[in-house]
Amino acid sequence: MNAKILVACANGAGTSLMMKMTAERVTQKLNMGVDKIHHCALSEGVSSARQYDIVFAPLNFLNMYEDAKKAGVIVIGLRNVLSDAEMEEKLVESGAAEKFSA
């Protein structure tokens, strides 16, 4: 099974694009199957999060994704949104790396 991943930041422009590139590197390193990685602003992310398997957002905005979390989406908050190491650690801790193993 391949994952659909959403990465969201405040404006959905530069930082979320860099988060997307980080997610691409990390999921490849973990040998995860990924159908798509979409980047957007937090507001778009909140309304579309249920359509994804995994959502990455800054830690201080995590509460905005409670509905998605209740619906079974793996919601991951990041302290440093551009850290490969943190993203990798959180994917492993959450079980997502194993669940979506290629």
What are these regions (language model features)?
Residues 2-43, 51:
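Conserved active-site segments centered on acidic
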Residues 11-12, 60-62, 81:
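Short glycine-rich anion-binding loops that position phosphate/pyrophosphate groups of nucleotides
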Residues 39, 57, 75-78:
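Structural signal for conserved beta-strand scaffold positions within catalytic alpha/beta enzyme cores
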Residues 41-48, 64, 86:
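Short acidic active-site motifs
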Residues 48-50, 70:
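A short, aliphatic-rich alpha-helical micro-motif
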Residues 54:
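Short, Asp-centered acidic motifs that coordinate Mg2+ and/or phosphate
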Residues 58, 66:
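Glycine-rich nucleotide/cofactor/substrate-binding loop typically near the N-terminus or early
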Residues 74-102:
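Ser/Thr/Gly-rich flexible loops in soluble cytosolic domains mediating phosphotransfer, phosphorylation
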